[in-house]
Amino acid sequence: MSKKVTDTVQEMAQPILDDLQLELVDIEFVKEGQNWFLRVFIDSENGVDIEECAKVSEALSEKLDEADPITQNYFLEVSSPGAERPLKKKADFEKSLGKNVYMKTYEPIDGLKVFEGKLAEFDGQTVTIEMTVKTRKKRVNIPYEKIANARLAVTF
């Protein structure tokens, strides 16, 4: 159900975002407690502000009300993905070269399933993370298809 909803919402949202020159980062349709939430995460080269989120929310809400593809009552939230934005597409990895990332894999690679470090390289098939293990710097090559989830990581 959730995948069907997000696919439908993506089809409805994309023309709105294209008109505003915004990027669709992710869509979530989740139940938290008794309530359902439809979360749409948007971004652009220069980030997004509250006015852009409001424009997308109003336009998308109108389309959703017309088509009525979701049977449950839900809250629509449109926002920026934040500082720790998810890396979902290959283009996200390319744009994030040199930045700190946090990544989980489906199966262990070099004995680990969790990686945090600098995104050093991405060739479209393999992600190379430069990380510190104990006191040594280490480069780990992770096949793209083995990545369960990835996001930017804020370090202090």
UniProtKB/Swiss-Prot annotation:
Annotated protein name in UniProt: Ribosome maturation factor RimP
GO cellular component, one term: cytosol
HAMAP family xrefs: RimP
Keywords: Cytoplasm, Ribosome biogenesis
Gene3D superfamilies noted in UniProt: Ribosome maturation factor RimP, C-terminal domain (2.30.30.180), RimP-like superfamily, N-terminal (3.30.300.70)
Species assigned in the record: Bacillus velezensis (strain DSM 23117 / BGSC 10A6 / LMG 26770 / FZB42) (Bacillus amyloliquefaciens subsp. plantarum)
Cystine pairings recorded for this chain: none
Similarity section: Belongs to the RimP family.
Protein's job: Required for maturation of 30S ribosomal subunits.
Gene Ontology biological-process entries: ribosomal small subunit assembly; translation
UniProt gene name: rimP
Subcellular location: Cytoplasm
Pfam families membership: DUF150_C (PF17384), RimP_N (PF02576)
